[in-house]
Curated annotation (Swiss-Prot):
The record marks 261-262, 267 as: Important for interaction with integrin. It comes from the Eukaryota. Pfam families: FGF. The modification Omega-N-methylarginine is found at residues 108, 110, 112. This is Fibroblast growth factor 2. Residues 52-64, 113-132 have a biased composition (Low complexity). This protein binds heparin more strongly than does aFGF. CDD domains: beta-trefoil_FGF2. Inactivated after 3 minutes at 60 degrees Celsius or 1 minute at 80 degrees Celsius. The gene is FGF2. Monomer. Homodimer. Interacts with FGFR1, FGFR2, FGFR3 and FGFR4. Affinity between fibroblast growth factors (FGFs) and their receptors is increased by heparan sulfate glycosaminoglycans that function as coreceptors. Interacts with CSPG4, FGFBP1 and TEC. Found in a complex with FGFBP1, FGF1 and FGF2. Interacts with FGFBP3. Interacts with integrin ITGAV:ITGB3; the interaction is required for FGF2 signaling. Interacts with SNORC (via the extracellular domain). Interacts with glypican GPC3. The keyword Ion transport does not apply.
């Protein structure tokens, strides 16, 4: 009460109570009757959090938590994720992480593919030459078969198509004259260069002049001549060399060859030997 002008005036200025001055609010004010019941009736609101703040991401960002999660992660547990953990072989299926990719079978990736089984190596031995040519060391004149299809000796007079023996030394054709002379000539039209080769046994042939009706023979002094009948001097070993030329070596005089000089004359058998151009002959068809 304040006295103003001799009278008493009541002070009605609102003043904070004890609980308001302390700042404890209604919860801490025990002086107001029913304050506890009034506070319990009020709805409680939870504090709002910023949407960008995530406790899990915050925990994952801490060094201690990140290290602990890295240690607990098992090897090969990530399938198809971007993690840096190493996956087990074949565990990653289409992921873009840094783990090892599964083995690729038949693909174009960098993984190791299953190798196709290799073909078994060919058996060792002679191989056929290109375009049907024969291998070196084989024979070109095959044994003649009996007309009845049975086995036995080769029938006399059974010849193949006529041939011309072209010598590499000088380009001469082997010629057999009716008088028994033997030499070389370059003219293809000469009828005395037509020869028939008959296989007496495997790799052994006899050479007969068609027009001369004589057989090529190697004499004991190394001369070449034509004989009217077949003797043991008329058989020659036929061999295909590596340069596709044939050689004809005497079966009786095994170190002597049929040969022609560069002048077209025959060469003595005693002066012949392997590797000479004079002993190389190329069988050609006599029909052309």
């Amino acid at each position: 009460m304040v006295g103003v002008g001799g009278g008493d005036v009541e002070d009605v200025t609102p003043r904070p109570g004890g609980c308001q001055i302390s700042g404890r609010g209604a919860r801490g004010c025990n002086g107001i009757p029913g304050a506890a019941a009034w506070e319990a009736a009020l709805p409680r609101r939870r504090p709002r959090r910023h949407p960008s703040v995530n406790p899990r991401s915050r925990a994952a960002g801490s060094p201690r938590t990140r290290g602990r999660r890295t240690e607990e992660r098992p090897s090969g547990s990530r399938l198809g994720d971007r993690g840096r953990g190493r996956a087990l072989p074949g565990g990653r299926l289409g992921g873009r992480g840094r783990g090892r990719a599964p083995e690729r079978v038949g693909g174009r990736g960098r993984g190791r593919g299953t190798a196709a089984p290799r073909a078994a190596p060919a058996a060792r031995g002679s191989r056929p030459g290109p375009a049907g040519t024969m291998a070196a060391g084989s024979i070109t004149t095959l044994p003649a078969l009996p007309e009845d299809g049975g086995s036995g000796a080769f029938p006399p007079g059974h010849f193949k198509d006529p041939k011309r023996l072209y010598c590499k030394n000088g380009g001469f054709f082997l010629r057999i004259h009716p008088d028994g002379r033997v030499d070389g000539v370059r003219e293809k039209s000469d009828p005395h260069i037509k020869l028939q080769l008959q296989a007496e046994e495997r790799g052994v042939v006899s050479i007969k002049g068609v027009c001369a009706n004589r057989y090529l023979a190697m004499k004991e002094d190394g001369r070449l001549l034509a004989s009217k009948c077949v003797t043991d001097e008329c058989f020659f070993f036929e061999r295909l060399e590596s340069n596709n030329y044939n050689t004809y070596r005497s079966r009786k005089y095994t170190s002597w060859y049929v040969a022609l000089k560069r002048t077209g004359q025959y060469k003595l058998g005693s002066k012949t030997g392997p590797g000479q151009k004079a002993i190389l002959f190329l069988p050609m068809s006599a029909k052309s």
